[in-house]
Amino acid sequence: FISPLRQLANIYNAIQAALAGAERVFEVIDTAPETEDIPGAVGLEHLKGHVEFRNVDFSYEAGHPIIKNMTLEALPGQTIALVGPTGAGKTTITNLLTRFYDIDGGQIRIDGHDLRDIRRAELRRALGLVLQDTFMFADTVMENIRYGRLEATDEEVMEAARLADADHFIRQLPQGYATVLSERAANLSQGQRQMLAIARAILADPGILILDEATSSVDTRTEARIQQALLKLMKGRTSFVIAHRLSTIRDADQVLVIKDGEIIERGKHS
């Protein structure tokens, strides 16, 4: 009598798990494809990194604005720090710059070109991202770094790791650069994963850099090492930095305080 009931309970659990998985699959299937480049879209040869937001409006849902009439300018090589409470719109600003979403009004310009007039593939190649939680593949350390520029040589990969202050810990791994990481690099510390992410960005050599809470999940000692690697990465590049820690934003050329999708204060840290 008990055995059929157990089987029924197991079947019910399996069905529930399958439904949850199916829901995620349908979300992917229902995702709208990105719009194609317009005819005559331009490239970004000789990128300088001059970024402008001109009266930009954006909402994920109609009638619920997230970014409101935002105007900002980053000159080539400048570092712009975006600070503010959670949900203020900081990450949305960088999502608009990468053109993960199209704006509702206003203009975003890079080197004088409207973002919508730039070939999307070239725009993405010009941008480098270091996020709070960077995805790593179940592959070797070498190939995970090479993902930043697939045609890079082994020597270029190792040089990027040296600049990111990652070479030392990599060589201490069981097979060095040939060490295979587990899914999402669970066999590395958070700080080590961030150093690999920085090495990946250095290898990509982007003209514009986006750092989204890149040091928020590490201890202060590890943060100091990562911060030094980030300074090398940011040198000469237009950079947008989202952070709460003072150490990350104190050298920024501009600090923009964001609240409810608007810039409520701007200046330099002093």
Feature locations, PLM:
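Short cytosolic juxtamembrane segments of multi-pass membrane proteins
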Residues: 31-32, 184
